[in-house]
Design a protein with these regions (language model features):
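Flexible phosphate-sensing "switch/lid" loops adjacent to ATP/NTP-binding sites
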Residues: 1-258
Length: 258
C-alpha cells in the first residue's frame, strides 16, 4: 500500500507562524483536490478542541483538519500537554487525560510515548494522500533533542520534506534561520527544502538583498510572507479560504540543493 507523502512546517521558535502556515497549506492542498490531513505529534496548549468521539486535541489541529475538509480526530494530535503550573502539565494521550506530570517526569518518560506517535502517524498515512505536519518550538534545542518527539524525529519517520519558518517581525531573522540550520545534523539539514521569512511588513523590495543573502548562504529557496492584520492567532480556530498564503517574493540560489 502506498503511504502518504509528508510535508512538515518547522520553526526557529514558538510563535513564528507554524500553525497558521500549516492551516493554510492544508487548505491549499485540499482545494487542489488532495486528500489531506494535519498532524502534530505533541502540542502544549490550554486551547483544546473536542472531536466527534469526545477526544481532546489541540485547537490548532482541529482548525487544520477543517481547513483540509476532514473531521478532527485524535490521531492528528496524539499527545497534548495542558499546563497547570510552571512545572506541571495534564497529559492527554489519544484524546484522553492520563494524569498530571511534573516536567522532569514527563521528559524522562517521553520516549515511552513514541510508539503512540508512530501509530497515529501511520494511521493517517494509510488513509490520506498528503500529511501536513506541524513541528513544535524549534528543532535545534540542543538540551532537549534526545527526547524531542515533535520535530526531526517525526520528519524522519514520515520521510517528510521540511519548510523552516522564521519570524522577521521579532528581529534577527538571519540568525534565526541560518543558526537553526547550522545546529542541525547533516541528515536533518538535508530534509530542509525551503526557508520562509514570515510576518514581513512594508515594501518587499527593501528586503530583496536579504532574500538573496539567505538563499546564497543556505543554498535553499526563500519565500517571504506578509504580516496580515486579518490573521490573528485565534484565526486558526476557524475555517477560512482566506488562509491561502500570499507570497510577497522569493528567490532561489543557482547553487541551492534540488
Amino acid at each position: 500500500m502506498t503511504r502518504a507523502r509528508a510535508l512538515m512546517v518547522q520553526g526557529t521558535a514558538s510563535g513564528v507562524g507554524k500553525s497558521v502556515l500549516t492551516t493554510a497549506l492544508c487548505r491549499v492542498l485540499h482545494e487542489e483536490g488532495f486528500r489531506v490531513a494535519p498532524f502534530k505529534a505533541q502540542n502544549m496548549s490550554l486551547n483544546a478542541a473536542v472531536t466527534a468521539k469526545g477526544g481532546e486535541i489541540g485547537r490548532a489541529q482541529a482548525a487544520q483538519a477543517y481547513a483540509a475538509g476532514v473531521s478532527p480526530r485524535v490521531a492528528m494530535n496524539p499527545i497534548l500537554l495542558k499546563p497547570e503550573a510552571d512545572n506541571r502539565s495534564q497529559l492527554v494521550v489519544l484524546g484522553r487525560a492520563t494524569g498530571a506530570y511534573a516536567t522532569e517526569a514527563y521528559w524522562g518518560a517521553g520516549n515511552t510515548l513514541w510508539p503512540v506517535v508512530r501509530a497515529a502517524l501511520a494511521e493517517l498515512r494509510r488513509e490520506f494522500e498528503i500529511i501536513v505536519i506541524e513541528g513544535a518550538g524549534s528543532p535545534a534545542e540542543l538540551n532537549l533533542r534526545h527526547a524531542d518527539m515533535a520535530n526531526m524525529r517525526v520528519a524522519a519517520e514520515a520521510d517528510a520534506s521540511v519548510i523552516l519558518v522564521g519570524d522577521i517581525e521579532r528581529g534577527g531573522v538571519f540568525a534565526q534561520l541560518l543558526g537553526t540550520l547550522d545546529l542541525l545534523s547533516p541528515s536533518e539539514r538535508a530534509r530542509v527544502r525551503a526557508l520562509v521569512v514570515n510576518k514581513f511588513r512594508g515594501d518587499a523590495s527593501l528586503f530583496e538583498d536579504g532574500v538573496r543573502i539567505l538563499s546564497e548562504r543556505a543554498r535553499l529557496p526563500v519565500y517571504v510572507l506578509p504580516r496580515s492584520s486579518r490573521i490573528r492567532t485565534s484565526a486558526i480556530t476557524t475555517t477560512s479560504s482566506r488562509l491561502r498564503p500570499r507570497v510577497l517574493g522569493f528567490a532561489t540560489s543557482a547553487a541551492h540543493a534540488t
